[in-house]
C-alpha cells in the first residue's frame, strides 16, 4: 500500500492516477472538507486528516510500505487561508509525517522538494523543504528526495505572472538565466517511478529537455502570439527586500518572490536525463508554450 499525502493537488493527483493505472493500492490523506470524489472514482482509499494533526498521520500510515509526500500549504496560503502557516504545515507537519511513517514501519519515503533549495535565499518554503530533507537524511527508511526545476504550468503561466493571453510577463532581475522548465506531468511520471522502482536514488534532481531564460520565453511568446508582451522587470534588490519584509507577514508571497529570484540567480545545473532513463519523453518549454499559444487562438 502506498500513501500519498497531497493527492488532491495538481502534481499529487497526477501521481495518484499513474500509481493506480499501474495497478498499485493507494491511500490518500485528505483534509476534512476537501472533495475526495476524484480519488474515490479511481479506487483510492481515503483517510481524512491533516499534516498539522499528528494522530491522523499515525492512522494514515498504518499498513503502508511507501509514503509519497507532495503536499504543500503554499497554494492555500496564497488563496488567503490564515492557518496553518508554511512553517506549521510544510515543516512541523512534514516532520510529524516522517515520525508517523517511521513508527508504522514504512520502508520508503519519497519527498518532493525543489532544485536550488540550497541557494540560501531565506524563504519560509526553503526553510521547510531543507528541514524536511535534513529530517529524512537522519531516517533509517529508504528516502528519495525529488528536486524538480520550476514547473512549466506554474511559472510559464498566468499563475506565475507569465500571461501570454493578457500580454503581461513579470521578470525578477535580468531574466537571462537559463532554466530547464519541466512539465508537471513529467514530474508526476518520475515521482511515480521512484516510488515503485527497485533501487531508487537517494536524491534525484532534474528538469525539462530545453534550457531557456525567462526573456527567451517572453520573446517566444511574442513570436507565437504575434503580440507584443509587456515585460515588467523587478530588480533583484527589491525581491530580496520583499522576502525579508514579507517573511513573517505573508510567508507564501515571500516564498514566491524567492522562487522568482532563484530563477534569476541559479543557472540550472540539471537536465532531463533522470526522466529519459525511466522512459519518460519530457515536454520542452518551447513545446509547452506552442501548445498554450494554440489554445489561445
Ligand atoms: N511549482 C513548482 O514550480 C514546483 C517546483 C518544484 C517543486 N514543487 C513542489 O511540488 C509540489 C507541488 O504539488 P502540487 O502541484 O500537487 O501542489 P498543490 O496543487 O498546491 O496541492 C497541494 C496539496 O497539499 C495538500 N495540503 C495542503 N495543506 C495540507 C495539510 N495541512 N495537510 C495535508 N495536506 C495538505 C492540499 O490539500 P487540499 O486540496 O485539501 O488543499 C493538496 O492536496 C510541492 O511540494 C511543491 O513544493 C513545485
Task: Give the positions of each predicted feature.
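Glycine/proline-rich active-site loop of Rossmann-fold NAD(P)-dependent oxidoreductases
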Residues: 154-162, 194-204, 227
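Terminal hydrophobic/aromatic helix or amphipathic segment near a protein terminus
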Residues: 219-266
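N-terminal Rossmann NAD(P)H-binding glycine-rich loop of SDR-like oxidoreductase domains
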Residues: 2-24
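Substrate-positioning beta->alpha
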Residues: 173-195, 202
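NAD(P)H-binding glycine-rich loop region in Rossmannoid oxidoreductase-like domains
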Residues: 30-103, 118
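Amphipathic terminal alpha-helices
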Residues: 270-297
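Glycine-rich Rossmann NAD(P)(H)-binding loop
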Residues: 172-177, 204-211, 222-226, 234, ...
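Glycine-/Pro-rich loop/turn segments that contact NAD(P) or position catalytic residues
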Residues: 73-165
Amino acid at each position: 500500500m502506498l500513501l500519498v499525502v497531497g493527492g488532491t493537488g495538481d502534481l499529487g493527483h497526477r501521481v495518484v492516477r499513474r500509481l493506480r493505472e499501474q495497478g498499485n493500492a493507494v491511500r490518500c490523506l485528505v483534509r476534512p472538507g476537501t472533495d475526495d470524489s476524484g480519488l474515490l472514482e479511481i479506487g483510492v482509499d481515503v483517510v481524512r486528516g491533516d499534516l498539522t494533526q499528528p494522530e491522523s498521520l499515525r492512522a494514515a500510515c498504518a499498513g503502508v510500505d511507501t509514503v509519497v509526500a507532495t503536499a504543500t500549504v503554499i497554494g492555500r496560503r496564497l488563496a488567503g487561508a490564515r492557518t496553518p502557516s508554511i512553517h506549521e504545515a510544510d515543516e512541523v507537519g512534514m516532520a510529524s509525517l516522517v515520525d508517523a511513517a517511521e513508527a508504522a514501519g514504512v520502508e520508503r519515503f519519497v519527498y518532493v522538494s525543489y532544485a536550488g533549495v540550497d541557494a540560501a535565499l531565506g524563504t519560509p518554503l526553503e526553510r521547510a523543504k531543507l528541514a524536511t530533507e535534513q529530517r529524512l537524511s537522519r531516517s533509517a527508511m529508504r528516502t528519495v528526495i525529488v528536486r524538480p526545476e520550476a514547473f512549466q504550468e506554474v511559472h510559464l503561466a498566468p499563475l506565475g505572472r507569465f500571461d501570454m493571453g493578457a500580454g503581461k510577463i513579470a521578470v525578477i532581475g535580468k531574466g537571462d538565466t537559463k532554466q530547464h522548465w519541466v512539465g508537471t506531468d513529467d514530474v508526476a511520471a518520475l515521482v511515480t517511478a521512484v516510488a515503485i522502482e527497485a533501487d531508487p536514488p537517494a536524491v534525484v534532481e532534474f528538469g525539462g529537455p530545453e534550457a531557456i531564460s525567462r526573456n527567451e520565453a517572453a520573446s517566444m511568446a511574442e513570436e507565437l502570439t504575434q503580440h507584443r508582451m509587456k515585460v515588467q522587470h523587478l530588480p533583484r534588490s527589491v525581491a530580496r527586500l520583499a522576502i525579508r519584509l514579507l517573511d513573517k507577514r505573508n510567508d507564501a508571497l515571500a516564498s514566491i518572490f524567492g522562487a522568482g529570484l532563484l530563477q534569476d540567480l541559479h543557472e540550472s545545473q540539471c537536465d532531463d536525463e533522470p526522466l529519459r532513463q525511466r522512459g519518460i519523453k519530457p515536454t520542452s518549454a518551447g513545446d509547452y508554450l506552442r501548445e498554450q499559444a494554440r489554445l489561445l487562438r
